[in-house]
């Protein structure tokens, strides 16, 4: 009986705690209500005017707050160099470095904080400190693996001209593979290339396996096999690549105007609605749509030029553009 009473008491205390937490959350929401919703029209599109220290509703123009705190730095900077010089904090944390960028490095200039040269005795000591610091930064096999793989990822991403978010995503995918011990029995370069390919698809910055293989040190077959393995083991939800994703890059390589690009996207959208892109390589379909659009827009490019930029053959472009023109009733004057 005593145990039953204790359980009832604990349950009542738990319910009371939940109710108190709920009341506090409601009070907090009520306090922040004026900061997230306009009291006049109920709009949520609020704009911070930092010059006037005002919070303004974009829908009705009501000034909700005219004395909010500016939490930015007290100094002013007009370009990137000035911001870097005046900033008193370090670089942000990043997954592209094996220690996430949290460690420091001893400078190699052999000068003190005032710019004066360091004596020979202190110089020898600094040399030894640098050597030991390099050893401490990479202390075990996992960190050595990450240091090599992430530098390889950065090299490949630089060669492909990939943005920062793709590099961060690739580093996270590779770290997850290391945590689940998926590296065993596979080359570091192969897993790194597969992680980069997966990151490109996740971030909708498509690159083909052939493009990844060109900048990596492994074959296309190994990259594809490793990619399928890690995507299955890590449960990566990757949608099929759309031909539309390739259009901006191919049009940029062919120096085509925005009108041609928009028309190519519209052609591909109509082709997708009629299921003309199913079972076909996205690069070939995208190249054919761009070829048709360039002719219709008066900025004709030859099949060879389009094929070189898209990385497909001229035969593929001919087959795809004839199919698109026939099914979509597009009249092309060659």
UniProtKB/Swiss-Prot annotation:
Key words of the record: Metal-binding, Repeat, Transcription, Transcription regulation, Zinc, Zinc-finger
Ranges occupied by Sequence repeats: 151-234, 245-326
GO cellular component: transcription preinitiation complex
SUPFAM superfamilies: Cyclin-like, Zinc beta-ribbon
Origin superkingdom: Archaea
Gene Ontology molecular function terms on file: DNA-binding transcription factor activity; TBP-class protein binding; zinc ion binding
Amino-acid positions noted as binding Zn(2+) in the UniProt annotation, renumbered to this chain: 38, 41, 57, 60
One Pfam family this sequence matches: Zn_Ribbon_TF
Zinc finger (TFIIB-type): 34-65
InterPro entries registered for this protein in UniProt: Cyclin-like_dom, Cyclin-like_sf, TFIIB, TFIIB_arc, TFIIB_CS, TFIIB_cyclin, Znf_TFIIB
Protein role: Stabilizes TBP binding to an archaeal box-A promoter. Also responsible for recruiting RNA polymerase II to the pre-initiation complex (DNA-TBP-TFIIB).
NCBIfam families given in the database record: PRK00423.1
HAMAP family, per the entry: TF2B_arch (MF_00383)
Annotated family: Belongs to the TFIIB family.
Designated name of the protein: Transcription initiation factor IIB
Taxonomy of the source species: Archaea, Methanobacteriati, Methanobacteriota, Stenosarchaea group, Methanomicrobia
